[in-house]
């Protein structure tokens, strides 16, 4: 939530781009479907690995606050994840060309975002540093503008960390970073 709010705050843009099938949490800022309390007119769902998606980002860049990418999508583009345990313990990463195809996709997405001045956000709340010591950025060799980490940072304890380029993080006072506590 903090990364999306921060992305929307900085450029004054409202539209968030998510990829089909990607999971970014259970809050109404990115979840569409039955039971949603509000219409998601500020969230756009595009297809992974599709050149049309890149064109949409280029054409609508002036409206887009950020593009969210969940690295788990590399194992099953445009579909919901089959099972969390299967994704991280199976040999699907080693026997499939999904890494190469998704790396190429992320590089093209990175270029489209940079050309449109749209922040690219890697949502690593689930994957964290499980794909590589340097996270998704190291695994795919593509730098994000902002990265979100979750429980993997704290050994399974509930925590969230948002990292980003200085100009994106300027909303936060370095002496008093945003803190949220739920009891």
Q: Predicted regions: what is each one?
A:
Residues 2-183:
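Conserved N-terminal phosphate-binding loop of PLP-dependent enzymes in the Aspartate aminotransferase
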């Amino acid at each position: 939530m903090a990364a999306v709010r921060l992305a929307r705050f900085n450029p004054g843009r409202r539209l968030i781009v998510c990829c089909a099938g990607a999971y970014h949490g259970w809050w109404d800022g990115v979840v569409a479907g039955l039971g949603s309390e509000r219409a998601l007119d500020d969230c756009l769902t595009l297809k992974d690995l599709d050149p049309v998606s890149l064109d949409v980002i280029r054409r609508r860049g002036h409206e887009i606050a950020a593009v969210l990418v969940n690295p788990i999508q590399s194992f099953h583009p445009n579909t919901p994840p089959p099972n969390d345990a299967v994704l991280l313990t199976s040999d699907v990463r080693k026997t499939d060309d999904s890494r190469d195809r998704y790396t190429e996709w992320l590089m093209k997405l990175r270029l489209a975002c940079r050309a449109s001045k749209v922040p690219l956000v890697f949502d690593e709340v689930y994957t964290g540093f499980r794909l590589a010591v340097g996270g998704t950025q190291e695994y795919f060799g593509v730098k994000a503008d902002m990265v979100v980490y979750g429980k993997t940072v704290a050994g399974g304890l509930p925590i969230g960390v948002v990292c980003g380029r200085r100009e994106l993080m300027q909303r936060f006072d370095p002496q008093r970073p945003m803190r949220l506590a739920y009891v």
